[in-house]
């Protein structure tokens, strides 16, 4: 299972949790991997595996930006990519924190938009998100 995405041609892997077997496999294959973390123990494990960037998930439910700032303080070399509860109203505050490389947000690509074939709306929401990000990080 851990090699299915790579065999299908995935150029990078982002996961909701930290599975050491998946991380090690990706490192062996030279595939960038960003596993999900939600607490300092997860970050410790990521560091042990040689990672410098982790996903923080579910961001808002796990304490949001305040939790990321708390975790970033002792782990000065770690960068974060929060997802889960990120939206057009809060993305700027996340992106303003320098330890955050990027944010993910499903508000841009909702399942019902895909189901209904509303791809123009998806493009517009994605462009909106890009402009929001550019306003913080030109």
For each feature predicted by the language model, list its residue ranges.
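Catalytic beta/alpha-barrel core
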Residues: 2-3, 9-18, 32-43, 52-60
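Glycine-enriched alpha-helix->loop->beta-strand junction motifs that scaffold or abut catalytic
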Residues: 7-13, 27-34, 48-53, 74-78, ...
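Aromatic/hydrophobic pocket-lining residues that form π-stacking "cages" and hydrophobic walls in ligand
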Residues: 22, 26, 42, 68
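C-terminal helical cap(s) of enzyme catalytic domains, especially alpha/beta-barrels
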Residues: 26-31, 112-138
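Generic secondary-structure signature for well-ordered alpha-helical cores
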Residues: 73-77, 96-99, 127, 131-138
